Regions:
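Short, solvent-exposed loop/turn segments at the edges of secondary structure
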Residues: 1-3, 52-54, 260
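Flexible, glycine-rich linker and terminal segments associated
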Residues: 20, 269-271
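Phosphate/diphosphate-binding loops
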Residues: 4-8
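C-terminal outer-membrane beta-barrel translocator/porin domains of Gram-negative envelope proteins
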Residues: 25-191, 195-220, 257, 265, ...
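C-terminal structured "cap/appendage" subdomains that terminate the fold
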Residues: 200-203, 209-259, 263
Length: 271
């Protein structure tokens, strides 16, 4: 699918640490679904068309008491984001995410950091299928390192033209990370090494072949047994071009069909 549109948002500070975000967006999503696409995609197009339009209001709140946004050693960061498709449009939906980060100084140089994030999406009004192009994806940088990006969640393996299962994403997700950071010897404060433990998964609708031999789909209910875990080590560098992170990860409970990726890097701050 391909999404085009425009958005406008602005932030309003109302305390030293708190900020509110307000905005809106209009989007048109062109869905190219055919007989080899996941059955849920085909049913969605049959019901809502191949080019649904949505107008959504966005709202958010953040609180940031970290001592440094690039390389924090203490403090808390929270962010709540909401997106609601307005009534009367092709799709009426809502989705929310909440992120919580906490940095604990263990000594002058060692820091323990926690990051947790949850996401939830659903529909209302005349819409009864959550738009799959609004799904959450888990896996890879920013969630569970050691697995390929966006691969931890419901899959559809009914496409006989494709040996690999399609990663569908989900309308619910959880991920959490714990990092222990320390500076490299030599006093260079722009370089830090870290060890980490990640966990996460997304839940939604998975594809399967029913008793009649036809492609179908069903909800994948929340279960902690679906969670994937990984651990590893890495280097964080505040470079002249911006913050960089390099990690070497080892999946702890890889299951059949999972796609792994040991070495990963990211540009930007945060987990």
């Amino acid at each position: 699918y391909e999404t085009r549109g425009a958005s406008l948002a602005f932030g309003i500070p109302f305390t030293e640490n708190d900020r509110v975000f307000l905005g809106g967006k209009i989007e048109s999503t062109k869905v190219d679904a055919n007989s080899n696409s996941p059955q849920r995609y085909q049913d969605y197009v049959n019901r809502y068309g191949a080019d649904p339009v949505s107008v959504a209001a966005t709202v958010g709140w953040s609180r940031d008491s970290r001592d440094n946004s690039l390389a924090p050693t203490r403090g808390v960061y929270q962010r709540l984001n909401g997106e609601v498709g307005l009534p009367g449009m092709d799709i009426e939906y809502y989705k929310f995410t909440y992120q919580y980060q906490h940095y604990f100084p263990l000594s002058r140089t060692w820091t323990l950091a926690f990051n947790g994030e949850v996401g939830y999406g659903d529909v209302y009004g005349q819409t009864d299928m959550f738009p799959f192009f609004k799904n959450f994806y888990v896996g890879g940088i920013g969630s569970v390192r050691g697995f390929e990006s966006g691969t931890l969640g419901p899959k559809d393996s009914t496409n006989k033209m494709n040996d690999d299962a399609d990663n569908l994403g989900g309308d619910r997700m959880v991920n959490a990370s714990l990092e222990l950071l320390a500076p490299l010897p030599g006093g260079d404060r722009t370089l830090r090494i870290f060890g980490f433990l990640d966990a996460g998964y997304a839940w939604g609708y998975e594809g399967f072949v029913n008793a009649n031999g036809h492609a179908d789909y069903r909800r994948q209910e929340f279960s902690m047994s679906d969670m994937r875990y990984s651990t590893g080590i890495g280097v964080a560098w505040i470079s002249p071009l911006g913050p960089l992170k390099f990690s070497l990860a080892f999946p702890l409970n890889e299951k059949e069909g999972d796609k792994t990726q040991r070495f990963q890097f990211q540009i930007g701050t945060g987990f």
